[in-house]
């Protein structure tokens, strides 16, 4: 079974970011101990919505997200504080549309590299690129993105690793959608990747099988990524 992921966009109310950052300290701590947890990596939007958060949650089995994480006393306590402080922009509560979630299976790629000395750092720069293929063409889109992973992986070696994550995620509900999750050591490293020949060639290769795309950028500040789940292999 492929690892299960949720990419969460959380739309905060004006000025809410400092309190969100506080709430995520215990949430990140408890997440790392949960049996199925592999990733729980959070950042602040840098595309003009500073009170919006972006988080990647990863689990060895979907039960970790739908049942395990929300069942913890820490989660219930912190979500109560979120509601009391009205940290969501439009509607409070777990059912709020301000929790904008996409559900994925890992398709291909890497979230960490064993030769990256900073692979566990909490302050990387993240770009999530959503792609939508024409009807019936997602398989080709996924294949093209996966070929790009291999080229990117081969382009760097220790000790000079700047591209820390380059993962192709297959959306579970939208059968035309895929997301490329990119994590670099800094924003400058992301800008360097964007202007590189290898990245431009990938975007060019994708054009025939891509109808629409969106780029969302964030600066990470807490969490863990690609750990072995405490429960062990599933």
Q: Which residues are covered by each model-predicted region?
A:
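Short S/T/G/P-rich N-terminal loop/turn motif that feeds into the first structured element of a domain
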Residues: 1-234
């Amino acid at each position: 079974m492929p690892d299960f992921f949720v990419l969460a966009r959380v739309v905060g109310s004006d000025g809410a970011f400092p309190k969100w950052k506080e709430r995520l300290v215990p949430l990140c701590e408890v997440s790392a101990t949960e049996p199925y947890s592999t990733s729980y990596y959070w950042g602040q939007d840098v595309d003009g919505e500073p009170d919006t958060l972006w988080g990647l949650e990863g689990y060895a089995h979907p039960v970790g997200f739908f049942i395990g994480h929300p069942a913890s006393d820490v989660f219930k306590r912190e979500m109560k504080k979120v509601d009391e402080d009205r940290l969501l922009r439009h509607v409070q509560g777990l059912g709020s549309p301000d929790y904008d979630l996409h559900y994925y299976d890992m398709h291909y790629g890497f979230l960490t590299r064993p030769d990256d000395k900073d692979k566990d750092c909490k302050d990387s720069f993240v770009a999530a690129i959503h792609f939508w293929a024409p009807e019936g063409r997602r398989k080709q889109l996924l294949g093209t993105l996966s070929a790009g992973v291999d080229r990117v992986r081969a382009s760097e070696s220790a000790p000079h690793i700047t591209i820390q994550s380059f993962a192709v995620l297959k959306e579970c509900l939208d059968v035309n959608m895929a997301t490329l999750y990119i994590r670099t050591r800094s924003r400058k490293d992301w800008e360097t990747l964007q202007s590189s020949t290898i990245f431009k060639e990938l975007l060019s290769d994708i054009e025939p099988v891509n109808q629409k795309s969106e780029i969302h950028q964030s600066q990470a500040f807490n969490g863990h990524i690609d750990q072995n789940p405490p429960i062990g292999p599933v």
